[in-house]
Swiss-Prot record:
Its main location: cytoplasm. This is Phenylalanine--tRNA ligase alpha subunit. InterPro entries: aa-tRNA-synth_II (IPR006195), aa-tRNA-synth_II/BPL/LPL (IPR045864), Phe-tRNA-synth_IIc_asu (IPR004529), Phe-tRNA_ligase_II_N (IPR004188), Phe_tRNA_ligase_alpha1_bac (IPR022911), Phenylalanyl-tRNA_Synthase (IPR002319), tRNA-bd_arm (IPR010978). One of its GO terms (molecular function) is magnesium ion binding. The keyword ATP-binding applies. Coiled coil: none annotated. Tetramer of two alpha and two beta subunits. SUPFAM superfamilies: Class II aaRS and biotin synthetases, tRNA-binding arm. It is found in: Cytoplasm. Its EC number is 6.1.1.20. It catalyses: tRNA(Phe) + L-phenylalanine + ATP = L-phenylalanyl-tRNA(Phe) + AMP + diphosphate + H(+).
Length: 365
């Protein structure tokens, strides 16, 4: 028994030494196979237990099983240790030196696109006025884009030369790229009871392209629905927005009669400005006027389409082009440059990352 025990001790010491010296997982796997493979040293010893008498098995069984358990534990521990070493080496290799100086060249620094900046500015202003942000799909149905918004069947906007239509589906229904963000008004009224106060920024699509128009452009509109909303409320909201957005203490606005299928009465809004200097527009002063947005009281048919009773609820809505007001505020002459992906243009007109616009800190600080 002493010779047998001595042999087991020698085997155990040899296996533990091999495990300790294993430098990687393949080496560990080789030791495991040498010990516990089909013809491994420990496996062969375990096979002998079946041929032993009960007395021999009682004496040698715990010794052999103890060897097996200790070698197994050593293999598991060494595998975990090697895994930790590998992770530490990888982390060291991929480490970023945060003490390195920042990139100084404007071309190397990322900039926020003016459209993203202006959307954040709009969200900050209307958020301060108690409005929520609403969104909807870019691909719309004819119903939400036109019918529910009181567009008659023969309206020019329904024609192929103005709107991007998809092929009709198997039911003959056709979808389209939305021509305005107004479908979100209907979707919101369908699932939310008044009072409703939302602004809706997003992409819109029309077949138009020149220095001031793009086939894809950005629009924002607002919607207020309750039992007492009126033109005076709308006028106040729009004045507060224009003062905050153009960062002027006061602004003069004039409202002109117009026509939109989804509002009655419909109005277009001009804002006072000074265009006496070439290539520059100053708001809140001067004797010139510039159209800035369209607005009106929500048409009763639109309220009905949204599931609301026009005898109980009323509201007002307005809309404007985000690209256009960005051009006016920041002096960008050509809308097409917004979408050219020119890093030189973006480094000139872009904004510093992480400087989120707030009314307290300054919208365009």
């Amino acid at each position: 028994m002493n010779d047998a025990t001595s042999g087991l001790d020698t085997l155990e010491n040899s296996l533990l030494a091999d495990i300790a010296s294993a430098a990687d997982e393949p080496a560990i796997e080789a030791v495991r196979i040498a010990a516990f493979g089909k013809k491994g040293t420990v496996s062969e010893m375990l096979k002998t237990l079946g041929a032993m008498t009960a007395e021999e098995r009682q004496l040698k069984g715990p010794v052999i099983n103890g060897l097996k358990n200790r070698v197994t534990e050593a293999l598991t521990a060494r595998k975990a240790e090697l895994k930790d070493v590998a992770i530490a080496a990888r982390l060291a290799a991929e480490k970023v030196d945060v003490t390195l100086p920042v990139r100084q060249s404007p071309a190397e620094r990322g900039r926020i696109h003016p459209i993203s900046q202006v959307i954040d500015e709009i969200a900050a202003i209307f958020g301060d006025l108690g409005f929520a942000i609403a969104e909807g799909p870019d691909i719309e149905t004819d119903y939400y884009n036109f019918t529910a918004l009181n567009f008659p069947e023969g309206h020019p906007a329904r024609e192929m030369h103005d709107t991007f239509f998809f092929q009709p589906d198997e039911k003959g229904e056709r979808k389209l790229l939305r021509t305005h963000t107004s479908p979100v008004q209907i979707r919101t009224m369908e699932k939310q009871k008044p009072p409703i106060r939302i602004v809706i920024p997003g992409k819109t699509y029309r077949q138009d392209s020149d220095a001031t128009h793009s086939p894809m452009f950005h629009q924002v509109e607002g919607l207020v629905i309750d039992k007492t909303a009126n033109v005076a409320n709308m006028k106040w909201v729009l004045e507060e927005f224009c003062k905050a957005f153009f960062e002027v203490p006061s602004v003069k606005m004039r409202f002109r009669p117009s026509f939109f299928p989804f509002t009655e009465p419909s109005l277009e809004v001009d804002i006072q400005c000074d265009r006496s200097r070439p290539g520059e527009v100053r708001f809140g002063e001067g004797s010139d006027w510039m159209e800035i947005l369209g607005c009106g009281m929500v048409h009763p048919n639109v309220l009905r389409a949204g599931g609301l009773d026009p005898d109980e609820y009323q509201g007002f809505a307005w809309g404007m082009g985000i690209d256009r007001i960005a051009m006016l505020k920041y002096g960008m002459p050509d809308l097409r440059a917004f979408f050219d992906a020119d890093v030189r243009w973006l480094s000139h007109y872009g904004f510093r990352p992480l400087d989120m616009p707030t009314l307290f800190g300054g919208l365009s600080a």
